[in-house]
Every structure is written in structure tokens, then in C-alpha cells.
Amino acid sequence: MSSSDRDIIDIESGEEDLYSDGGNDIIDIESGEEDLYSDGGNVSDDYNPVDDTISRSEKSYVVVKEEDILKLQRDDIEQVSTVLSVSQVESIVLLLHYHWCVSKLEDEWFTDEERIRKTVGILKEPVVDVNGTEVDIQCGICFESYTRKEIARVSCGHPYCKTCWTGYITTKIEDGPGCLRVKCPEPSCYAVVGQDMIDEVTEKKDKDKYYRYFLRSYVEDGKKMKWCPSPGCEYAVEFGVNGSSSYDVSCLCSYKFCWNCCEDAHSPVDCETVSKWLLKNKDESENMNWILAKTKPCPKCKRPIEKNTGCNHMSCSAPCRHYFCWACLQPLSDHKACNAFKADNEDETKRKRAKDAIDRYTHFYERWAFNQSSRLKAMSDLEKWQSVELKQLSDIQSTPETQLSFTVDAWLQIIECRRVLKWTYAYGYYILSQERNKRVFARTFSLSCCSAEAENGLERLHHCAEEELKQFIGKIEDPSKNFGELRAKLIDLTKATKTYFENLVKALENGLVDVAYNESQSIEEPESFTKRSKTRKIKTLI
């Protein structure tokens, strides 16, 4: 089965890994030396793309460990070697050239084998005589004479001593992943250097580095896998599309990211909006907007001047020294009063527009940044809760930690909701940046209503987890506090908040065209938290 046709397995965060932890004592394919590939090891032999398949109504992806990547590589190498009747070393060269796309390789090979051989550097016959009778052979690099055993060649037959081969290949490995496609040292020769030569002449540390590049090439050169961007994580994610617009995936290291752009998970906001927003946060253009909004140019030298006192009599700094009125920008020497109405000139209009743009951007950015910092704080609180405080609560309440998992669920829900809420402000910023028409105002109103409901629910949940729950941790417990009531309250708030945000995400994914909580979607809140109606209805203006 080719890599391009391989099925993808669905995975949900928190479930057990789909692969076994088989041994990784791997034997070289041909030489028998230790290497990354073998039939002798049992690296994830239970890997089965059919097992544990979840409904295709959700996005399909699978988190893959390095040993599983090795097995997938080995399977592709063996398939190509069998189908094309070439050695496994040549299979590796071909797969690297075709970026591990087995189907494309096989199609083009059977269409024009000779052209493919020449393109990748696999020669059928050497270009120099390798069957001579001379005892000593001159190295093509150092020009010293060596015995046949001290000389090594690739398919072209050009002779080089093993010492020169070692230096040549080691230099290529130190240069980076380009070492996977090393050619013969002869400048005019296009013959490729295979893994058999790498194994023969390189030291262990260089060989390990080479095979590290080789392993990573399966993910980085292909189109279906990407490495988890979390620092230190060695998992990759294989992805398949089933019609959903979200690319968010959850790695086994617990890091959630967008598979498409490799930024933090940002559903339901699309990658383009995220890219524009992050770029805007770094863009120096906001500095120019601030200058336009908060300063006026000196009428004489045109340098921007910020007014920092109450008086309208302004003096430009040296060497200009121009005196003028801040209100009307006229020289003070012939200035009487500037209380007559004057229509805004072009510069004043620009300043007002710049100030409006800054105020609008600041409004959304502050809320985006607040939810980001709140999310990071919640992640820190969860870590502290799981490592210290959960055990304290378990001891105080004489309850197993497994029965207190609802507290962890609450914190996880808070973290996820902060993430979603953060990106709604980036989404909202670009809605208001569009043409002012009825549809845009309707979408803005819908977003405001949905996010307000969700944010209010989140704040109540966050307060309960951060303040009320922690009141039950300490050396002395207030007997007036009823932990059972808090348990029910926290569970209800977690469910209600989850429903709010599911509706918000659905509304954003649908473009806020159909935003309504009907009777079947009513959200019931704990009576202790609100006196308002338990059923809310939101309708758009569209």
C-alpha cells in the first residue's frame, strides 16, 4: 500500500495511543549492521490504519510516534524495492527524490525508467573501468595510491579512498539535510551516494545525525504529516480531510495546534485571519497611526509634535523654533483668536481616522491579550492543582482523586474557552473593518450576543474553580461549607459553559448567519448563579 493511499486514523485527545511500544533494536537492511531499518525489530508491528477508527463526521488525524514513522518508511522501501525490482538502497534514493510519494514514483518509473535513473543518479553501468588488474589505485581526491580494499566507489565507479570518502560525507552531513542527496565527488558526475556508502565510511555520531535527517524527511518532505511544534515534542500528526473547516489537532504531548499553519489552535477563526492579526500585532504601522492620532506637524518644518501641556501656544524644538497655535496651526505673531468654525481639512480628517483606528484596534487587542494571559494563568493553575492541591483536597474530603476528576475537567474547559474567546476578538476586529452595511452590523450584533453569553458563563465557571473550590483546601475546613453542593455547581457550570462555547463556535463556523438558541438548545444554569431565565434566545438581524 503506498503512502499516498494510506488510510488515516482518527484520534481524540486523552485516549490511549494507537500504537504499541515495540522494541527498536533495528538491523541494517543489507549489511546486518545496526541501523534504523530491519525486519528483526518489532517497532509498532500492531500499527493498523483500520483499528480504532472514529466516525468520519469529525476531522481525521493520527498522532504518530517516531518508531511508527520508521515502520512506515521501511514498508515503503520494501514495496518500492519489490515492485520496481531494485535494491533497497536504490529504493531509498528514489523515495527521497519523490518525497516519499510511492504512487507517483511507480507511475513515472514505469513510464520512463531510463530518464528517472539519470535524474536521480542511479547508473546501471559504471562510467569508468572498475575491473582493471592494477594492484594500486589512485584516489581521485588525495591522489595517493591504495589497494582495492582501501578504495570505495558508488555506481559511477570513480575511485576514492575511504578516508577521503569519510571527510567528504562528514562535511555534507554537517551542512544539514542536503546530505540525503549527496552526489559523487567528481564535479561532472551525477551518480548518487547511497546509504550503503554512508554506513561503510562514517563514524557513529555522523551516521546517527544522517539517519535523524532521514527520519525527519518522511514528515518534512511529505504532505500528510507535520511535526508537533511544541518544543521538545517528537510526535508527528498525520492528517486527513473530511469536509470540516477546522485544522485543530491535539498532540499526545497535550499541545493543541493548527495543522495547517502550525500556530496555536485557533478554531473557529481561519488561518488567514490569524495570520493577519498576528502580523498586525507586530507591525510598525500602528506606530504611524499613533503619530497621526496624537501629534500634529509643525507648520514650518513638518516634524510631528505631541502636545503635553494645557496651553495652545506651541514652540517647535531647535533648530526650527517656530511658534504657533496648536488649535489652528497659525503663527502666534499674527494670531488673535481661533474660535471661528472651520471645516476639517484633510490632515485633521486623517488624524481623526487614525485615532478611530487605534481606539478600535486597542479595544479588541486588549481583550485578546487579556484572554491569552488568563489562559496561560489557567494552565499554570491547572498544573499546580494536579501536582499539589488535588491531593490536598482528596485528603481533606477523604475522597479518591479519581472521583475528583470533575475539578480537572473544569480547568480544562476554562483553558479551552479562553482560547476560543481570545480568537473571537480577532474575528470581531475584522468584521468591523469591513464595509458598514446591514449584513456586517447583523454579524457584529450576533457575535456580540453569542460571545457575551459565552463569556459570562466562562467568568462564572472561572470564579467557581479559582475562588470557591480553593476554599476547601487548607488545614482547617469551615464546616458550614458544603462540598457536595460545590461539586454539583461546578459540574453544572462546566456543562453549561461547554454548551455556550459549542454554540459560539458553531455560529462562527457558519459565518454568524444562523445564530439562535432554540428550545432544544436551551442552556440550564445552576439556580444559585442566576435569577434570569434558564432559556435564552438570540436572533440575528439577517
From Swiss-Prot:
InterPro entries: Ariadne, E3_UB_ligase_RBR, IBR_dom, TRIAD_supradom, Znf_RING, Znf_RING/FYVE/PHD, Znf_RING_CS. Zn(2+) 3 binds at residues 228, 233, 251, 253. Zn(2+) 5 binds at residues 298, 301, 316, 320. Zn(2+) 2 binds at residues 156, 158, 184, 189. It catalyses: [E2 ubiquitin-conjugating enzyme]-S-ubiquitinyl-L-cysteine + [acceptor protein]-L-lysine = [E2 ubiquitin-conjugating enzyme]-L-cysteine + [acceptor protein]-N(6)-ubiquitinyl-L-lysine. Residues 10-19 have a biased composition (Acidic residues). Zn(2+) 6 binds at residues 325, 328, 335, 338. A zinc finger (RING-type) spans 139-189, 298-328. Zn(2+) 4 binds at residues 258, 261, 266, 271. Keywords: Metal-binding, Repeat, Transferase, Ubl conjugation pathway, Zinc, Zinc-finger. Its EC number is 2.3.2.31. Zn(2+) 1 binds at residues 139, 142, 161, 164. Binds 4 Zn(2+) ions per subunit. A zinc finger (IBR-type) spans 208-271. Residues 135-342 are annotated as: TRIAD supradomain. Belongs to the RBR family. Ariadne subfamily. This is Probable E3 ubiquitin-protein ligase ARI11. It comes from Arabidopsis thaliana (Mouse-ear cress).
